Amino acid sequence: MAKAPKANTPKVTSTSSAVLTDFQETFKTSKRAYFAQIEKYPKLKLIDTFCFFLVLLGVIQCTFIILIRDNFPFNAFLAGFIICVGQFVLLMSLRLQLCNSFPGISKNRAFAEFIVASLILHFVCLHFIN
C-alpha cells in the first residue's frame, strides 16, 4: 500500500501574521498621509468632523429603528438616512476637489457645486417626507 504524498500547506499563523503586518504598515502609511494632508489644508478638519457626525447620525437612526422594531413613518426614516448618506458623499467629493486632485476645477467652483447639489438633495428629501 503506497502512502499518499504530503501536501505542502503553508502555516496559518505565518499567513495571518503577514496579513497583520501588511495591514499595520498600510494603516500607518494612511495615517501619515492623512495628517500630512490635514497639515497642508487645515479646513479639511471641519469637513471630516461633519462627515463623522453624519456617520454617527446614520448609526443612531438605524439603531433607533432596530430598537423600537417599528418603522411607521418609514418615509421619514428613509429621508433622514438618505440625506445622511447623500450629504456624506457630497462632502467627500468636495474634500477630494479641495485637495487639488482635480487641477481644472477651482476651489470656488467646487464649493458652488457642493452648495447647489446639497440644496437639491435637501429639497428632494424634504418632498419625500411629504
UniProtKB/Swiss-Prot annotation:
Variant or mutagenesis effect after changing residue 127 to Y: In OST2-1; ts; reduced activity
Membrane topology: Multi-pass membrane protein
Keyword Cell inner membrane: no
Membrane-spanning intervals of the chain: 46-66, 72-92, 110-130
Keyword tags: Endoplasmic reticulum, Membrane, Transmembrane, Transmembrane helix
Listed GO CC annotations: endoplasmic reticulum; endoplasmic reticulum membrane; oligosaccharyltransferase complex
Outcome after substituting residue 31 to M: In OST2-1; ts; reduced activity
Phenotype for residue 69 to C: In OST2-6; ts; reduced activity
Subunit composition and interactions: Component of the oligosaccharyltransferase (OST) complex, which appears to exist in two assemblies comprising OST1, OST2, OST4, OST5, STT3, SWP1, WPB1, and either OST3 or OST6. OST assembly occurs through the formation of 3 subcomplexes. Subcomplex 1 contains OST1 and OST5, subcomplex 2 contains STT3, OST3, and OST4, and subcomplex 3 contains OST2, WBP1, and SWP1. Interacts with SEC61 and SSS1.
Protein name: Dolichyl-diphosphooligosaccharide--protein glycosyltransferase subunit OST2
Gene: OST2
